[in-house]
Amino acid sequence: QPLMEFSGACEGCGETPYIKLLTQLFGDRMMIANATGCSSIWGGSSPVTPYTTNECGQGPAWSNSLFEDNAEYGYGMYIANRTKRQHLASLVEESLAKNVGSDSLQALLNDWLEHMAEGEGTQQRATKLAAALSEEADEDPLLTKIYEQKDLLVKTSQWIVGGDGWAYDIGFSGIDHVLASG
């Protein structure tokens, strides 16, 4: 299901079909760093938004940056999320090493750890693990810490969106920096 609808963009706009497709593929775990431009007008004009959620209340997270800083802004979002998830992984590793929780919870923690870098199936693994953690989190402070960070169980899909002026001219040095960073 597309998680972008009723954008209010100009008739024939070439940007919206791409974003609609991205939301169909990644929308329930998508983070968008948007450069100021047309997409900030049709994508974030208060009091409405074209983005919506699925039946579980999951949908794209959209944020807008200054025109020239968007590549760095989006890259910063990615790095911050990656760092938080690495910390969560260290907590999961510690809980597995200490044999904390039931066998079924340990199996779910191990499965999450093995697949934490994969987008495919991340929502399903996160849902199962969060449910199991909710039942056992009070039994150990380490499980409580993991459960408190359950929003990080899903691997996000980070997107940096901008127009041609941003990509070819004003924001090029930022794009170059992000690409050079790997």
Kindly give the residue locations of the regions a language model identified.
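Cofactor-binding active-site loop characterized by glycine-rich and histidine/acidic residues
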Residues: 1-182
